[in-house]
A protein has these predicted regions:
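A broad, low-specificity signal for short, low-complexity segments enriched in glycine/proline
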Residues: 10-17, 39-42, 52-57, 89-96
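N-terminal membrane-targeting segments
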Residues: 1-28
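Extracellularly exposed regions in secreted/surface proteins, prominently low-complexity, repeat-rich
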Residues: 135-166
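BRCT (BRCA1 C-terminal) domain core and associated BRCT-interaction motifs
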Residues: 66-68, 74-138
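Residues that form or flank phosphate/diphosphate-binding pockets in enzymes
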Residues: 10, 62-63, 103
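Residue-level signal for the start and early helices of compact helical domains
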Residues: 7-10, 43, 54, 86, ...
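Extracytoplasmic low-complexity, Pro/Thr/Ser/Ala/Gly-rich segments
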Residues: 25-85
Length: 166
């Protein structure tokens, strides 16, 4: 009986210590989720090297999600999908990128029918490009453009596929 009491007291003591102990720390995640890649003039950038966020600015439910799925089918890496702020007004499609004339922005813009507006800005999260779908969205081209040549030498942050998107 003494042995059982000792096991019970010891187990209770260990259990209470574990219950109130500091949890183990999570492993550190690298701050960079992409690596720089320099493309020389004429070198190709493919869709699987571009992460795209898609935001709905048109009000039709599900447009951003459907467009994101279609872009993934074309080979683009998925980014954030959601709604644009209420004050944003878009006709067909707006492509937002750090450099709107750069090959990654042009490759994304080449997927859409109709007039595509290019705007300089910083896409959210770790995306290279952000697409805003407007009220007059006419859709995506039936045959996707899967690669595009760089018009000039450019350094692009290519998503690191070893890190999961959150």
């Amino acid at each position: 009986m003494t042995v059982l009491t000792a096991v019970f007291v010891g187990g209770t003591y260990m259990g209470v210590r574990l219950l109130f102990s500091k949890p183990p720390s999570l492993p550190e995640v690298a701050a960079d989720t992409c690596r720089n890649r320099t493309l020389e003039r004429g070198e190709q950038l493919s869709t699987n090297q571009v992460r795209v966020n898609v935001l709905n600015a048109g009000g039709r439910s599900g447009m951003a999600n459907r467009t994101a799925i279609n872009l993934q089918t074309a080979g683009f890496l998925p980014g954030t999908v959601g709604n644009a702020p209420d004050e944003v007004r878009i006709g067909n499609v707006r492509v937002v990128a750090r450099e709107p004339n750069r090959v990654d922005a042009r490759l994304v813009g080449a997927q859409f029918k109709g007039k595509v507006q290019y705007t300089k800005g910083v896409p959210g999260d770790d995306a290279n490009v952000e697409v805003l779908i407007g009220k007059k969205f006419v859709g995506m081209k039936k045959k996707p453009v899967t690669a595009m040549k760089a018009k000039n030498r450019v350094t692009i942050c290519v998503p690191d596929l070893t890190e999961p998107v959150s």
